[in-house]
Amino acid sequence: MKQKGVLGELVRARLTSAEYDGLTKETVEKFYIEEYGQLPPPFEIIHSDKLQIGEESGFNGTAVHFFDENQGINEVYVINRGTEGDLSKFAELGEKWLETLKKYKQNPENLREIVFSGNEDIYTDAYEVLLGDDQSQIRDNQKFKNEVIQKVNEKNLSTKPVFFLDAHSLGGNQGQTLMVTSGDLFTDVNVYNDAPMNVYNIVRMHDKIRKTVEDKYGILADEHDIYKIKPSELYSILDTELGSYASKITYYRNEEDLLTNLTLPYAY
């Protein structure tokens, strides 16, 4: 049974959509009043960019913390947005293709900065979601989560905080990975037209699974040898460790959405 909180399913979905424009106090109040006919409990909005998180990786997320000591309210809604990009940036690179090629050949390790500047999410779609070869945005998501927890705890409320998570598209991939690498932190998770988790990202980011795989196969998870292990060989390990999370997550999918119909090679 889904955990009931201050926000219902419709408001959570609307806030996830509005996150792309940057959530404001006015937006949260507007949606709440339209749904419930009254002002929401006191709340604070925490933005990842205000904490200087995601400046290099392109990660962008928001948390809304509702709190009222008298009513025993202490709820946190973490929201992860999906892919954003500026295709004109690629056009500019095309016009300077020779200069771009020289920069890349001199510093191939700086591919994201050279080719994907301003399009970090598209880099993440390829190298994190598809290949599982980069975890920069996932790590920044974890940093953001830790900062949010710290800010919530600083209020010293007597009621234990309850954490919810909503995520769309690319954010769905990261949100699910955040959920399974955060123990029992998140009580209820909604994902909308999500990109699936990547098997190799989970192995690399989940401490217990990482150790199990490294011990069983005699490899280091961060090395390229991990790709010698077929995803099908890893599924049973992941199922055993992560099966309990299934009851916490709800998938909202539009069957006409392109992402929903894609079959990714390393998906979990």
Question: Which residue stretches match the model-derived regions?
Answer:
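Solvent-exposed, charged interface segments at domain starts and junctions
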Residues: M1-G8, Q71-I73, F163-A167
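N-terminal low-complexity, Ser/Thr- and acidic-residue-enriched intrinsically disordered segments
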Residues: M1-I33
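Helix N-terminus capping/helix-initiation residues
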Residues: Q3-K4, G37, D125, D257
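A broad, low-specificity signal marking well-ordered, structured residues that form hydrophobic/aromatic
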Residues: A13, G61, V76, I249-T250
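A conserved cap/lid and substrate-binding interface adjacent to the catalytic center
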Residues: T24, I33-F164, V180-D188, N193-D207
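Serine hydrolase/lipase
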Residues: E75, Q150-K155, T159-F164, V180-Y268
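Glycine-rich nucleophile elbow surrounding the catalytic serine of serine-hydrolase chemistry
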Residues: D166-M179
